[in-house]
Amino acid sequence: MQKVFEALASTPRRKILAYLAHADLTAGEIAARFEISKPAVSQHLTVLEAAGLVTSEKRGQFVH
């Protein structure tokens, strides 16, 4: 439960969740919408996944 609250405490992570609620996006696609680096998006996604709020799926060379 603590991990969920920590994940949701970040405004960028809440925005990422809102985007992912409507479409499967890669870190690169999310980064383009937020104008932040892909590594920063990947870190946010790692926190969200650790909290059980998102899952990842590899499709070819991309992770969705």
Kindly label every feature range from the protein language model.
Residues 2-37, 61-64:
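N-terminal helix-turn-helix DNA-binding core of bacterial DNA-binding proteins
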Residues 49-60:
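Beta-hairpin "wing" of winged helix-turn-helix
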